[in-house]
Amino acid sequence: MFLSPGEGPATEGGGLGPGEEAPKKKHRRNRTTFTTYQLHQLERAFEASHYPDVYSREELAAKVHLPEVRVQVWFQNRRAKWRRQERLESGSGAVAAPRLPEAPALPFARPPAMSLPLEPWLGPGPPAVPGLPRLLGPGPGLQASFGPHAFAPTFADGFALEEASLRLLAKEHAQAMDRAWPPA
C-alpha cells in the first residue's frame, strides 16, 4: 500500500479529498495605531453619537484615512470603555477610579510672525552682519500678504503640524543654542 502525503493512520477518515488543501493558518491582524489627529476626530464623533450610522462612519473613515471597519471596531471598543466608566462611576458602592480631567484644547491662533527669537540671522530686518543678506527671505510685508498659515509646514496628507508642538520644539532649540553659544 502506497500512501500519499497527508494520508496515514493519523489522518484516515478525516483526510482531505482530492483537490482539497490543508486549512491555512488564520491570519492575525496587527494592532492598529492611531495618530493624534485620528483619535481627536474619532473622539469628537463619539461625543456627537455613540452609535453613528454607516454613512457617518464611512465619512469619518475617509476623513481620517482609515478603513470603515477600523472605525466601526474603534466605536465598539470605545462604547465598551464608556460602559465600564459608567458602571464604575454609578458604582456598586465601591470607590470609583478617579477620572483624569481632559486636557484643555489648545487654541490654533497663530502668533505674530517670528514671535520667538531664534537666531539673529534667521529673521526679517536688517542683516546682523552688514553686506550679508538675511537667510529667511521675505520680510513681514510679504508674509502678511499670504496670510498666517501660508508657510505652515504640512504632512504629506495635508494636515498642518500642531502649532504647540512646533513652538515647544523652537523654544527647546533656542534654549539649547543659548547653552551652546553664550552671548558675547
UniProtKB/Swiss-Prot annotation:
UniProt keyword list: DNA-binding, Homeobox, Nucleus, Sensory transduction, Transcription, Transcription regulation, Vision
Region Disordered, annotated ranges: 1-33
CC annotations in GO: nucleus
Localization, UniProt: Nucleus
Binding partners and assembly: Interacts with CRX.
Entries under PANTHER family matching the protein: HOMEOBOX PROTEIN, PUTATIVE-RELATED, RETINA AND ANTERIOR NEURAL FOLD HOMEOBOX PROTEIN 2
Protein name according to UniProt: Retina and anterior neural fold homeobox protein 2
Organism from which the protein derives: Pan troglodytes
